[in-house]
Amino acid sequence: MRAREFLQLMGLGPGIRFYPFEIRPVSGLHGVSWVHWLVPKPPPSPNFILEVDFFSAFLKAGDWAIDIGAHVGDTTLGPALVCGKTGGMIAFEPNPTTMHVLSLNASVNRSCSNVAIVPFAAGDDDRYLTFEYGDHWCSNGGHHDVSKWVHGGAYTIHVKQVDTLKFLKEAYSPELQKVRYIKIDAEAMDWVILENLRPLIESKPTVLRLEIGETQEGQERGLRYLRSIGYTAYEVNDARVIDKFERYVPRRGSFDILAFSPEDPCYDSIMNLCTRATED
């Protein structure tokens, strides 16, 4: 544990703070802006030119997508721009500090996208939780079942968790029929949420973006899930395809995958995107 974290756990650190921001136009995309969050360790700004090209392989105007763990909108806005005003993105983000920036990004791009923000944590039941964070701007954290002295999260935020599929059916039933893409990054809850959404995923081909753990156990769990639903997967980094994910490979750090069904109506387009990238 770092000295700074120890002092924060002792109550000697600064309180939770909402940092200032700057709204800047995105070069090359007319009418699109990005809200830069001016925290000590800001998240990287997405390359929206690459993002729009990437997501256009399987999304189009009128489609809907779901982003679970939307953070400040860095994984939200790209697909939302492709879905356009006639479609949209349902973005789950329970953390009020990051949701503030997410809502700004949704608002400044309202003329060219449609982002519906859900201020709840996704799960498989309805309950209240406490999320813990290690930094006073609360950028990266979540619910932990161990002592704060183990995980180092000195800053707490109380959030409401919902049964994800039940909530979506009640609040977004028409949009749910048009969902083509789901991204999940919810700390330790990813697999719980995936199982909760399995009926939706199995009802029609849905492109998935998932985080896979670096360990052999984590990778094999991901592979078992993909085999159980008959999906093909490729490792991705932002809007770039890296390589096919089909077996355990020793590595350092978790990674993202893009997974899709051979029955997906855009299968050929997605495969072309993936194979072209891995051959370059």
Where are these regions (language model features)?
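S-adenosyl-L-methionine
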Residues: 1-167, 169-177, 235-280
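Conserved beta-strand termini and adjacent loop/short-helix elements that scaffold enzyme active sites
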Residues: 37, 118-120, 162, 211, ...
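Short internal loop-to-helix segment that lines adenine-nucleotide cofactor pockets
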Residues: 43-66, 128-130, 145-204, 215-220, ...
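Short, glycine/acidic-enriched loop or turn micro-motifs at the edges of active sites
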Residues: 70-72, 96, 122-124, 186-188, ...
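Proline-aspartate-enriched helix->loop->beta-strand connector
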Residues: 205-210
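A SAM-dependent methyltransferase catalytic signature shared across enzymes that methylate proteins
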Residues: 223-241
